[in-house]
Structure formats: C-alpha cells, structure tokens
Amino acid sequence: MSKTIAINAGSSSLKWQLYQMPEETVLAQGIIERIGLKDSISTVKFNGNKEEQVTDIPDHTTAVKILLNDLIHLNIISAYDEITGVGHRIVAGGEYFTDSVLVDEKVIEQVEELSALAPLHNPGAAAGIRAFREILPDITSVCVFDNAFHMTMQKHTYLYPIPQKYYTEHKVRKYGAHGTSHKYVAQEAAKMLGRPLEELKLITAHIGNGVSITANYHGQSVDTSMGFTPLAGPMMGTRSGDIDPAIIPYIIERDPELKDAADAINMLNKKSGLGGVSGISSDMRDIEAGLQEKNPDAVLAYNIFIDRIKKFIGQYFAVLNGADALVFTAGMGENAPLMRQDVINGMSWFGMEIDPEKNVFGYRGDISTPNSKVKVLVISTDEELCIARDVERLKK
C-alpha cells in the first residue's frame, strides 16, 4: 500500500487530494489559497472534519511545507516518507507530451516554456513541481497533461485553415483541454454501459465554468471543442467561446478600454460568457434565478449558452457517425438539470430521451428513458483520481 497525492497548482492556489493506493481511498483533501498574498488560507478536509488556518504563505514551497505539516499534525500521515508519489496536473503540454511522464528538470523547463499556451496555469504548476522536488526529492513525481488525451486527433482535425508555417514554426494548432476529465468519464461510462470502451462512440460534455465537448471514438479523442487555448468552443462562464476573429481588431479600434490584443483576449477570457452577456453572474444558479424573474439579459445569456452546446454536440454526432451515449459531467453538467433538459430538447432526431424524474432529482448514472437509442449519462468527474492512477502506473 502507498499514499499518492494529486496536485492542481495555480499561480496563487494549490488544490490537493491524498489517496491510499491501489485501493483508491481518499484520505484527505484540501486547498491552499492566496499564495503570495496576505492572509493565505489553508483548508484540510478529512473524515468528515474540516480544519482551516489563516497565515502568510509567500510561495509554493512554503505552501507545500504547510500542507505536509498539516497532514502530520492531523495524524493523516506520521512521516513525509509515507507519501510515495505525487502527480501534478498540467494544463498545457503542447506537442511535447502525448502521455503522462516522470518528472525531471527538462520536463519542468518544457512546462515553463509552454506557459504562453496557459499563462494562468503552467507557471504555478511548475512552481508546485519544484516545491515538491525540493521537499520530497526521492518520491515518484509525475506530470499529467490536460491536453495529452487529445493528441490522438488527426492532422486534418487539429490544424487550423491558415498558412501551415504558423504550425511548423510556431506550433499553432488545436490542443484541447480537460483531457483528464474526458478520459475518466469515458472509462466510467463504459463500466456503466457494461461494454468495452474500445467499441463505444461517446460524446462527453464537461460543463463547468469552463466548457468543453469531446468526440470519443473507441476510447480515443478524435475531436474536441477547446483549441489552441481553452478560450475556444461553446460559451462558458466568463469566456466567450468561438467568435469571428475579425471582431478583435474591430473592437480594439472602437473601445478606448481595449489598448491592444492582450486587453481584448483578457475581456474574452474573463468578462464574457454567461457573466458578460447577462451582466448578472457567471454562475448558472444565478442565471436560473434570473430566468425565474424573467430578466431578459439572463434569458438571452441562457439561450446562447444552450444553443452553443447543442451545436457542438450535433457536430460530434456527425463526426462519430452517431453515438452510443452522451455524458454530462463537471459542475453544471452534474448539477444543472434544467440545462441538461434544454440541451436535449429538440434533439429527439438523434434518438435521445431523458427521464424527467431522474434528471431533476440529481440522479447519477443513466438518466435516459428505456426507449432512448442514445443513452444520456450523468457522471461525476474525478480528475484527481485519474492523476493518482497515472502515478501508480508510472511507478511500475
């Protein structure tokens, strides 16, 4: 038996989950927030308990020390060396990595080099890797890449219809994201359906604050909605998703608040989507409250959101030449029955029917009717477990 910790580090946060492996038992989980700021917060949840402390955590190395000391103080572990593996979630792995890898200095440097593809994620992830290597230099350390699952896409799918020099010289292409989540829920869907993953055609819809849809053919990603960056695809919580690129120079010329392309991209990433259109919130619960109040901006934002998700699902039915199941996962995918119902409404031609009672009452699993030709599943994603499994796989 061994203990493995899954890490999701950002620029100012470090989310973690500790597992007993190979049993896959969660021993504890938590998050350290406001790294580098005053009044940092460390939260640990274990055995139904919750411990929280407020202190100053200037950097990721200090954060890791506090995390490990908390585990000892709370008797979750008795010594550092009980942890034999650590897995780090990396958003952007570019074309360097088609699978999870053991960490060495070259891997860390490549993660840092790819920060342009994920400026909010890769630098923090690299800092987290270095912190663990400094404090626990002898444990198995693994990088798990969000886009690696999508590296099975064919060239005609991942290349953009622009001059090829931008790919050959600058590696501009579709990379995708949320791959760890899409991989996990596809595996769970196969178990739920009682069929080998290698014979299934699945459409997996990761719908949280970030939204991505993936076409999965026999266990492999053949297309996905996120692109060169996670900005592409359907409308999201604060991201616009796909727009006509000519809009960017047009609005820069006319909006004095947008000084350059970086400002415009920031607006598309952080001030658009549900929040930007509604003017209310990026949270679907607030949007649904707006629907009840018949707020016209909430109604408009919601309708755009549903429309864009439907279109990607329809595309992937075409890409796969039909599907065995549609899987909803992540925050909204798992917890927004109205959204699921409205996505499915009007898609009866594809052979999908959901049971209203199963859908509304938070049923996890198959929410489709017995007559539904395409099964509709709700599956809780578990990216952390997927990371821990990859650590165990690479230990052997």
From Swiss-Prot:
PROSITE patterns per record: ACETATE_KINASE_1 (PS01075), ACETATE_KINASE_2 (PS01076)
Cofactor(s) needed by this chain: Mg(2+); Mn(2+)
Catalytic activity: acetate + ATP = acetyl phosphate + ADP
Keyword Lyase assigned: no
Binding locations of ATP: 15, 206-210, 283-285, 331-335
Amino-acid positions noted as binding substrate in the UniProt annotation, renumbered to this chain: 89
Keyword presence, Cell membrane: no
Gene Ontology biological process: acetate metabolic process; acetyl-CoA biosynthetic process
Residues that hold Mg(2+) according to the record: 8, 383
EC number(s) recorded for this UniProt protein: 2.7.2.1
GO MF term (any one): ATP binding
Sites annotated Transition state stabilizer: 178, 239
Gene3D superfamilies (UniProt xref): 3.30.420.40
Subcellular location: Cytoplasm
Catalytic-site annotation from UniProt: 146
Cofactor note as given: Mg(2+). Can also accept Mn(2+).
Top-level EC class: transferase
Keywords: ATP-binding, Cytoplasm, Kinase, Magnesium, Metal-binding, Nucleotide-binding, Transferase
GO annotations of cellular component type: cytoplasm
Function recorded in the entry: Catalyzes the formation of acetyl phosphate from acetate and ATP. Can also catalyze the reverse reaction.
Family per similarity comment: Belongs to the acetokinase family.
HAMAP family, A to Z: Acetate_kinase
Protein name: Acetate kinase
Organism in which the protein naturally occurs: Streptococcus uberis (strain ATCC BAA-854 / 0140J)
Phylogenetic classification of the source organism: Bacteria, Bacillati, Bacillota, Bacilli, Lactobacillales
